[in-house]
């Protein structure tokens, strides 16, 4: 459970501009995954690392930082797929889709989000699926 709480503590630092602190907490969470072998949250850790990377001050104009974030999102996707963790896969896909759309790759973003969204047959009233639907509609407009 500690990894779970560290993940969301790290994520919480992003919106208040404390990115370095968030990344430090995330490093602690990733170290726990390594030391314990409990990797249930690993995909989400990579996704959060990508989100925090995009909040670094130099991220806006630095394509290397944005490529780094994309790499973390793709790592999150790979881990989620290996674990058959569809909820983590959805979250990682949404993060990646937003980044791709910002760089003119809307068709790619829409296609990958539509694929994972289409997998779900229930739970459409959950926050993640509602957010995915909104994003999918935006990408389709």
Language model region names:
Residues 1-141:
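Helix-coil-helix junctions within alpha-helical repeat/solenoid scaffolds
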């Amino acid at each position: 459970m500690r990894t779970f709480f560290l993940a969301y503590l790290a994520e919480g630092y992003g919106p208040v501009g404390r990115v370095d602190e968030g990344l430090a907490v995330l490093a602690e969470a990733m170290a726990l995954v390594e030391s314990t072998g409990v990797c249930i949250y690993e995909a989400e850790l990579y996704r959060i690392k990508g989100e925090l990377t995009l909040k670094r001050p130099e991220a806006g104009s630095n394509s290397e930082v944005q490529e780094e974030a994309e790499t973390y999102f793709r790592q999150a996707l790979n881990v989620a797929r290996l674990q058959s963790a569809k909820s983590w896969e959805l979250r990682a896909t949404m993060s990646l889709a937003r980044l791709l759309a910002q760089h003119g790759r809307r068709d790619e973003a829409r296609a990958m989000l539509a694929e994972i969204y289409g997998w779900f047959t229930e739970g459409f009233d959950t926050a993640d699926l509602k957010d995915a639907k909104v994003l999918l509609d935006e990408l389709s407009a």
